[in-house]
Amino acid sequence: MDIPKQYLSLFILIIFITTKLSQADHKNDIPVPNDPSSTNSVFPTSKRTVEINNDLGNQLTLLYHCKSKDDDLGNRTLQPGESWSFSFGRQFFGRTLYFCSFSWPNESHSFDIYKDHRDSGGDNKCESDRCVWKIRRNGPCRFNDETKQFDLCYPWNKSLY
């Protein structure tokens, strides 16, 4: 039985893709439905994890809602000192953005919790593919791997109204 070369190439490609898919590892703290690093992606992307910690003080409960253009992670609550995290694959051209609204009694703010150009490049990028944030009343502060402190603090996003 003589197999044409074009079918042999196709067969090898199918075996390669099947092998890659079966070896893929995809674990999220919560599922992100449109995650480009999921097991059905042949082109791997670097995975990131964002951790959010309630550091409001005064026993304040933090209500928050995080999402991207494609993924809505839902409304959530963090008690004082609690943390929550989610993982995702970065977009191929480095345009990944996740933003969150945060509220507690008498206050409401929003912040871009993950911005590719801020968190994946430059001097203050997140190390080890993990961005850890403490949410404080005056703004979010990210862990700095150089100083080993939460001293990379940013202002809240400007309100649109």
Curated annotation (Swiss-Prot):
Which keywords label this protein? Glycoprotein, Secreted, Self-incompatibility, Signal
Glycosylation positions? 75, 106, 157
Locations listed in the record:
Secreted
Q: Where is the signal peptide?
A: 1-24
Q: Which residues form a coiled coil?
A: none
Q: Which biological process terms from the Gene Ontology are attached to this UniProt entry? A: rejection of self pollen
Q: Name one Pfam family in it.
A: Self-incomp_S1
Q: Where's it mainly located?
A: secreted
Gene Ontology cellular component list: extracellular region
Which family does the similarity line name?
Belongs to the plant self-incompatibility (S1) protein family.
Q: What is this protein called?
A: S-protein homolog 2
